[in-house]
Amino acid sequence: MLQPKRTKFRKTHKGRNRGLANTGNEVSFGTFGLKATSRGQLTARQIEAARRAMTRHVKRQGKIWIRVFPDKPITEKPLEVRMGKGKGNVEYWVCPIQPGKVLYEMDGVPEALAREAFALAAAKLSVQTTFVIKTVM
């Protein structure tokens, strides 16, 4: 699963996830893409599950790019622990997602196959998505 090798700080503030994606909002590497249309956060497990679903459906032909990386630690306290006594331990990593962000890209496969693969991947994710095709200028 994806997570940073090392970070400057172990734990972060919760923060807010506002606005629209102004970087990573266009298909750059492949021909087809899966773009988020809603706001949320994707866990490293969700990103990996979607990647596996796509890879298996296209039978490892073509190329897949993952355009998101979970670099925000989420902490949790153990069950039945009283409030206070410091911030909990890092349990998993997430990537904050804003509407317009391209999550995955694919190339080297027919459009129909790419649509099917992205539909399988979208079912594994906690944000709404749409299928996009690279615009040629």
Curated annotation (Swiss-Prot):
<feature type="compositionally biased region" description="Basic residues">
    <location>
        <begin position="1"/>
        <end position="17"/>
    </location>
</feature>
<keyword id="KW-0694">RNA-binding</keyword>
<dbReference type="InterPro" id="IPR000114">
    <property type="entry name" value="Ribosomal_uL16_bact-type"/>
</dbReference>
<dbReference type="InterPro" id="IPR047873">
    <property type="entry name" value="Ribosomal_uL16"/>
</dbReference>
<dbReference type="Pfam" id="PF00252">
    <property type="entry name" value="Ribosomal_L16"/>
</dbReference>
<dbReference type="InterPro" id="IPR036920">
    <property type="entry name" value="Ribosomal_uL16_sf"/>
</dbReference>
<dbReference type="GO" id="GO:0000049">
    <property type="term" value="F:tRNA binding"/>
</dbReference>
<dbReference type="GO" id="GO:0003735">
    <property type="term" value="F:structural constituent of ribosome"/>
</dbReference>
<comment type="similarity">
    <text>Belongs to the universal ribosomal protein uL16 family.</text>
</comment>
<protein>
    <recommendedName>
        <fullName>Large ribosomal subunit protein uL16</fullName>
    </recommendedName>
</protein>
<dbReference type="InterPro" id="IPR020798">
    <property type="entry name" value="Ribosomal_uL16_CS"/>
</dbReference>
<comment type="subunit">
    <text>Part of the 50S ribosomal subunit.</text>
</comment>
<keyword id="KW-0820">tRNA-binding</keyword>
<dbReference type="InterPro" id="IPR016180">
    <property type="entry name" value="Ribosomal_uL16_dom"/>
</dbReference>
<feature type="region of interest" description="Disordered">
    <location>
        <begin position="1"/>
        <end position="24"/>
    </location>
</feature>
<keyword id="KW-0699">rRNA-binding</keyword>
<comment type="function">
    <text>Binds 23S rRNA and is also seen to make contacts with the A and possibly P site tRNAs.</text>
</comment>
<dbReference type="GO" id="GO:0022625">
    <property type="term" value="C:cytosolic large ribosomal subunit"/>
</dbReference>
<dbReference type="GO" id="GO:0019843">
    <property type="term" value="F:rRNA binding"/>
</dbReference>
<keyword id="KW-0687">Ribonucleoprotein</keyword>
<dbReference type="GO" id="GO:0006412">
    <property type="term" value="P:translation"/>
</dbReference>
<keyword id="KW-0689">Ribosomal protein</keyword>
